[in-house]
């Protein structure tokens, strides 16, 4: 496994290439559709991944943090994107390719985030979570609680944790 990190939270130090942005978009969109097919209508799933275009991902990365997990030099199997919302940092998405789930890869990516939040001096974490039972369970097992702030017309909600 290979972990690649791009950290532009304090200042833009490294751009995200269009090619890498395309790989991220493909992972986010394919993963959301594969994992949650049947739980929501296709148009609802499309709304959940509307942020996943190469241009929007590149824009988020101008002041964001991205960790990408590769099985080899080319095979992207997971990612986590942290963005700024005002003064706060928020986990925008954490994705692991379905065939690599439940093998510790999501935990590895999450731990990158928790370490980042601590290094940035934050004592709290927030994440935007699609209303999928598996996503909610993942974060609850790490101490997050629902804040009750629905987003995207009730397709997702925020979860919060003190660190």
Each predicted region: which residue ranges?
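Short, solvent-exposed polar/charged micro-motifs at secondary-structure junctions
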Residues: 49, 157-158
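Glycine-centered loop/turn positions within well-structured domains
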Residues: 89, 103, 157
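Short acidic/polar active-site loop segments enriched in Thr and Asp
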Residues: 123, 145
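Conserved glycine-rich acetyl-CoA-binding loop
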Residues: 75, 93-111, 118-120, 130-137, ...
């Amino acid at each position: 496994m290979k972990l690649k990190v791009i950290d532009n939270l304090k200042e833009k130090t490294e751009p995200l290439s269009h090619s890498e942005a395309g790989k991220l978009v493909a992972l986010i969109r394919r993963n959301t559709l594969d994992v949650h097919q049947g739980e929501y209508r296709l148009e609802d799933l499309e709304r959940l991944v509307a942020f996943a275009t190469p241009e929007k991902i590149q824009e988020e990365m101008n002041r964001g943090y991205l960790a990408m997990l590769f099985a080899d030099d080319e095979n992207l199997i997971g990612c986590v994107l942290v963005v700024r919302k005002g003064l706060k940092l928020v986990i925008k998405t954490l994705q692991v390719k379905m065939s690599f789930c439940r093998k510790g890869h999501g935990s590895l990516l999450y731990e990158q985030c928790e370490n980042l939040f601590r290094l940035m001096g934050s004592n709290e974490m927030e994440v935007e979570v699609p209303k999928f039972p598996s996503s909610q369970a993942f974060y609850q097992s790490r101490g997050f609680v629902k804040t009750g702030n629905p987003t995207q017309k009730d397709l997702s909600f925020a979860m919060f944790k003190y660190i």
